[in-house]
């Protein structure tokens, strides 16, 4: 395949060689399929000028499939009707014939028999005759106009010869078969000249491409500007091939340097080869860069998803921090309200008591003055004078409660909302797009509020300044002067010294980086709002407010932090349960107890039933169904067992808030307490069969007998914050776990507050309490891990354990006589942990192992 440059194609012809070669190969294959091999190919001695269309390939005689097409010229067509001269010579006649055959494929004639003749009048082949398409006469066509693409009759052919509108049209004559006559290919500008059978018709009277072949066999190339001149020079100054005429007109020797093409061709081609090699190298580099761009695009896309995920996580964590802080502030508001309410209640009681006494005295004096004799009046005069003088001098508001404002003022950080956008952006961090940003906050800036910036919702006075690298709990004297203790009054401060309960008082956030528990330092959100509390005696209240406390006295007020307690690891030896409504499945196992045979009793709240398992976790039986009738349960939340009779005692939360009693086989016995109880939270049965119920929200303890009669009830609102578990010992003492006070409160059956066991840093957020077979107090909490802390009856810590498996949230726990504890978790499973060696003795110190 050779390429001839032309004005029409230009440089694009170099870029389309392979496409045209493919076209020619397809045409050659098509010729073979259409039967040209049966007709025969034209010989080189026969020139066949054929029009562009309307001829079937089978009309050409002499086709030979063994004679392949060897080339095709892409310059000016080498035919007698060419309107422009060629730029180069054709090396072979086969290329000329192939071009003519290609022109034949543009149209197929049918229905008439005509023959195509060459310029010398030689009949090539007979074809069906066609009619004139240039006029309406419908006469037989005798010629074909390539420019009009129409078959012409004799009249139309004559018009093409003499009319100016058809000037320069290329007309090819057609002869009827059998006549043997022929007409030459004509042009309107000049009559067609016949040629010999071995010649190719001239192109417009100019030299044919075959005559332009050089003697050496090389092709000559004509100048694009001077069409008759051959390119023989190369202008080095202009980097352009020129002819002799160009050296005179456009490239004079004085200003342009040019040489013969034969002399500089090799050197210039070497330069071109070097440029091509450089281009190949550049192309390879561009391919590598394309791969790099693709890799960068993939990395960029991955980083986009990662950045969005991190942003969502940061926002979620920030929302959680705000929610936790909201709960803390809500608790502070409730504490402030409770303290103020208790102060007003005490003043109210004193006023009411004094008013009753004064009313009685006035009534007695009136009746004395009305019905007694003067002598009798004089007998009581001194007494009445003294009593009335005391009444007149009585001041019920000795603490000035009525003189101080009673409103609860929330000191929100209102100034932060003026620049809330910048504040939130600092908390959320910034975006790095691959280049360093000068104003990006440091990594540690996110862990602590900036100087002078209080946490959201906190007043500036409650910020506790600490050092950035202070990871341990700060000594008490560091914060004694900075905490306004009077901002968090507790009800215990208003009681006499003998009644003071010493419950933990929430003092708000400690230090942002004071991680006192393992893993807290790794969480920047939880560490910023780490809570600490302090059991305060009234005798030291003034010292705390004054801030003049030495370190030794102050350290005695702090319970040991969690990091100072070495807890032994324990693992569970049994696990059972899953989510569902079938046997052995739970939707909310919120209460658990153990009977005298070691069976595990579970209150499945949302399934409205009680399930009983053996100590290996195998299902035994169940009772209860949803409803309010006898034998039906509605949201049972706690369960206890009477060790003497084996009866089950079940408490229900709202809307029924009552107690139901079933025998050991699950048969209904009785129910009571619906009009008495409000928010039952914990229940146990002591050794004498008395039912002790502790209520949250109203902070009340009610003692029933097994038939529902009230034996005792008393309020614990001054001591409890959020009770969630209860048990008794053999000393007629009631032990109540307080989740928010982080300790165990001990009361007598008459409601007298006795003592506290545990405290924050030791029993954080307890979920239950019980007495084991050795008479020891076992406190369970769910802070970070599932923890067990063992105390003596007087509050001395004996041991501490923690689970190897982290339990996110737990409902309830119960003790087993073999030294195990049953844990009801919010993952719908029950776990059995063994924390004491197995003992054969039964519990003698408590009738309840309920935690």
UniProtKB/Swiss-Prot annotation:
Disruption phenotype: No visible change in viability, fertility, development, body morphology or movement. However, animals are approximately 9% larger after hatching than wild-type counterparts. Mild defects in early embryonic cell development. No visible change in lifespan, however in contrast to wild-type, longevity is significantly reduced in response to dietary restriction. Furthermore, it suppresses the increased longevity and reduced nucleoli size of eat-2 (ad465), glp-1 (e2141), isp-1 (qm150), and daf-2 RNAi and let-363 RNAi longevity mutant models.
GO BP, sorted A to Z: negative regulation of ribosome biogenesis; negative regulation of transcription by RNA polymerase I; negative regulation of transcription by RNA polymerase III; negative regulation of translation; nucleologenesis; protein localization to cell cortex; regulation of establishment of cell polarity; ribosome biogenesis
GO molecular function, one term: translation repressor activity
Cellular location(s): Cytoplasm
A cellular-component GO term for this protein: cytoplasm
Residues at which Zn(2+) 2 binds: 223, 226, 246, 251
Annotated SMART domains: BBC (SM00502), BBOX (SM00336)
Distribution of this protein across tissues and organs: Present in cells in which nucleoli are absent, and absent from large cells in which nucleoli are prominent. Highly expressed in the gonads.
Biased composition range(s): Low complexity: 76-91, 176-197
Zinc finger motifs (B box-type), residue ranges: 127-174, 218-261
Residues that hold Zn(2+) 1 according to the record: 132, 135, 156, 160
Pfam families: NHL (PF01436), zf-B_box (PF00643)
Keywords: Coiled coil, Cytoplasm, Metal-binding, Repeat, Repressor, Ribosome biogenesis, Translation regulation, Zinc, Zinc-finger
Coiled-coil intervals, chain numbering: 303-331
Repeat (NHL) residue spans along the chain: 573-616, 620-665, 666-707, 708-750, 751-794
Function noted in UniProt: Translational repressor that inhibits protein synthesis. Represses the translation of mRNAs such as fib-1, probably by being recruited by RNA-binding protein nos-2 and the Pumilio proteins puf-5, puf-8 and puf-9 to the consensus core PUF binding motif in the 3'-UTR of fib-1 mRNA. Negatively regulates ribosomal RNA (rRNA) synthesis, ribosomal protein synthesis and nucleolus size. Its role in the negative regulation of nucleolus size is most likely through its negative regulation of the translation of proteins such as the rRNA 2'-O-methyltransferase fib-1, and dao-5.
UniProt xrefs under PANTHER family: BRAIN TUMOR PROTEIN, E3 UBIQUITIN-PROTEIN LIGASE NHLRC1-RELATED
Protein name per Swiss-Prot or TrEMBL: B-box type zinc finger protein ncl-1
Species, as recorded: Caenorhabditis elegans
Gene responsible for this protein: ncl-1
